[in-house]
A protein has these predicted regions:
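Intrinsic-disorder/low-complexity, polar/charged segments enriched in Ser/Thr/Lys/Arg/Asp/Glu/Gln
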Residues: 2-8, 45-47, 60-62, 76, ...
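Generic structural detector for well-ordered beta-strands
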Residues: 8-10, 51-53, 66, 99-101, ...
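A generic structural micro-feature
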Residues: 1, 40, 55-59, 88-92, ...
Length: 189
């Protein structure tokens, strides 16, 4: 199953500060619920893990993230992560492309596209649920990133994505689609 997500958000921080954080995978991982960097293999390749818990189903994907492109001049980055569920029940590949632009007044806007390809048990949840959960995760990521940029402790939990978060994301997504709001930018600050 393949899911493509387009997200954007704006923070009231200078582009150089935002780029400094987003170009460091170790710092990015601290803002992602359930994610951690286990080891740097070189300056562009990292071994990591992501924990998910969807109701009775839980998974821990372990794999590698490779920075394919990082341009400090244009503030563009492209990363590819590939992982396997530790229990052998699935695989995931995610390609993330992001670009930062300066906003009037000194803020920074980030636009990203994520292409996620999953197989195995987790794919049984369907594209809509995976999309809704991914949007919820992106929201938590932007909250944690903003907190870190402002010098506050991120509120994103280090643990796995929980069934409560999944249910909330699914209900929010379904209600939004029902009333025609499901396709709008939900990551803005």
């Amino acid at each position: 199953m393949q899911v493509t997500l387009n997200n954007s958000f704006t923070v009231k921080q200078p582009i150089a500060k935002v780029w400094s954080l987003l170009s460091d995978p170790r710092q990015v991982a601290t803002c992602m619920p359930g994610a951690e960097i286990l080891e740097a293999l070189d300056d562009k390749t990292f071994r990591g893990a992501v924990k998910l818990k969807l109701g009775p189903f839980s998974a821990q994907f372990k794999g590698e993230v490779v920075i394919e492109r990082m341009d400090a001049k244009t503030h563009e980055i492209r990363m590819v992560g590939k992982g396997k569920d530790a229990a052998g029940t699935g695989n995931a590949t995610m390609t993330i492309s992001g670009k930062l632009t300066e906003e009037p007044g000194g803020g920074t806007r980030m636009e990203s596209q994520s292409d996620l390809v999953i197989s195995g048990k987790i794919a049984q949840f369907g594209a809509r649920m995976i999309e809704d959960v991914s949007k919820s995760m992106f929201g938590k990521f932007t909250e944690a990133l903003t907190a870190r940029l402002e010098g506050r402790a991120p509120s994103a939990e280090a643990g796995a994505i929980s069934v409560t978060e999944v249910a909330g994301a699914v209900v929010k997504g379904a209600v939004g689609r029902l009333f025609g709001k499901g396709e709008k930018d939900e990551g803005g600050a």
